[in-house]
Amino acid sequence: MGKYFGTDGFRGEANMNLTADHAYKVGRFLGWYYSELKKRNGIDGPARIVIGKDTRRSSYMFEYCLIGGLVASGADAYMLHVTTTPSVSYIARVDEFDCGIMISASHNPYYDNGIKLINSCGEKMDEETISYIENYLDGEVELFGEKWTEVPYAHKDKIGCTVDYVSGRNRYI
C-alpha cells in the first residue's frame, strides 16, 4: 500500500483527502504515461482509457477532472457513465483499452469516493504503475530515464477526444 492508493484504489472523503486536483493529476499522468508507452513501442494513435462511475454526487466531479487530465495529455477518454466496477474491468479487457478507471468507494459512506485503476487485462493496476502515479502526485516521478515534475501537455491535433461509450456498458449489463 502506498501513500494515496490502498488495497482497492485511492479512497477518501470527497474534497478532503481525495480532491478534484488529485483526480486531474491522476488523469494527466495516466494519459501521458500510456501515450508515451505506445509511442516508445512504435504504436500509432492515442492512449485509450475507459472510465465508469457510480451514482455518488462527487463521482461526476471526479469523472470530469479525470477526463480533463486524460485529454490534456493526449489520451482518448471513453465514458461508460454510471456502471459497475466489473463492467469497467470487462470492457477494458475485451475492447483492448490501455487501462480502465472506476470512480467508486463501494460500500463506504456517501461522502467518500475513490479512484480504482484497472489494467488492460481487466485486473487491478500493478504496483509499479501505481507508485509512478503516487510519485507524480508528490511532485516528481523518475521514468524513462528522466525526472518529471510535470508531464507534457498535448498540443493541436494531439489533444485527446472524449467518447460516449454507453454501448460498451450496455454490452456488459
Regions found by a protein language model. Give the residues of each.
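Ferredoxin-reductase
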Residues: 39-121
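Short, surface-exposed, polar/charged, turn-prone segments marking secondary-structure boundaries
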Residues: 32-33, 77-80, 106, 127-132, ...
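An N-terminal, well-structured beta->alpha segment
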Residues: 1-68, 72-73, 152-173
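Gly/Ser/Thr-enriched, mixed-charge loops and adjacent short helices
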Residues: 13, 113-173
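Hydrophobic alpha-helical segments
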Residues: 20-25, 66-68, 95, 118, ...
